[in-house]
Regions:
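ER/Golgi luminal nucleotide-sugar-dependent glycosyltransferases, focusing on the catalytic module
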Residues: 1-222
Length: 222
């Protein structure tokens, strides 16, 4: 695992021992908009690997075969990540390597939005009811896909009408698939940014590209 400090371009003090996302070809200065995607962009442009995967500082995948109780948001929760958790969820190089070498892509389990606290009936409705989110942004992304990637339009609409989606922008992908996904994703998001005035968005609303990417990951992998 390689720790990356995101948004490094926005601060003068950095986390010792971490790679910063503001080296080489990067979008670090846009971290308030693109969230964890600035790390993914950095890895895409600057890191050569056989597989690429992303966790958050407080979110990880479970690599064990065991099922554990879920909270109302369908997540497994722990007070902190410690040695017990590392063992419990098989968070070690050997277990991760054995799994990822078997598949082209590893994702978190799909979450059913109808079982979350807000009880939305579809992925589209969940976004529409999201705090600080604007459904016009998701509609614009649909229009962009219709122009740039029409072969994905039916899939996009199927995902939006459905109840299941993968959230949090976490995954592990084989190199070729990762590069394809990054090119596809940022081609859509950069076009969205070009067409959208977010100057009056709230702090959370300004993170819209990150929120959109969560839904787009499901579309790409569908």
């Amino acid at each position: 695992m390689l720790p990356i400090e995101v948004g490094a371009d926005l601060r003068s003090r950095h986390i010792e021992g971490y790679i910063q996302d503001n080296t080489g070809d990067n979008i670090s200065a846009k971290n308030k908009m693109y969230c964890e995607l600035t790390a993914q962009y950095w890895a895409w442009k600057n890191l050569d690997a056989d597989y690429y995967g992303f966790f958050h500082y407080r979110r990880y995948l479970n690599f064990s075969e065991n099922k554990y109780p879920l909270d109302s948001w369908q997540n497994i929760t722990e007070e902190r990540l410690n040695d017990t958790c590392l063992k419990k969820y098989n968070l070690n190089d050997d277990c991760i390597r054995n799994l990822v070498e078997t598949y082209d892509i590893v994702l978190s389990e799909e979450k059913n939005v109808a079982k979350m606290p807000d009880r939305n009936t579809s992925v589209y409705e969940q976004y529409k009811n999201g705090r600080s989110l604007n459904i016009r942004d998701l509609d614009l992304v649909r229009d962009i896909i219709a122009v740039k990637y029409p072969d994905y339009l039916d899939t996009f609409e199927d995902v939006m009408k459905g109840r299941k989606t993968c959230l949090c922008n976490m995954y592990i992908m084989k190199k070729e698939l990762f590069h394809e996904y990054m090119s596809w994703l940022f081609n859509i998001l950069f076009e969205f940014e070009k067409q959208t005035d977010m100057s009056k968005y709230t702090v959370e609303g300004y993170r819209t590209p990150g929120h959109l990417a969560e839904r787009l990951l499901t579309v790409f992998c569908w």
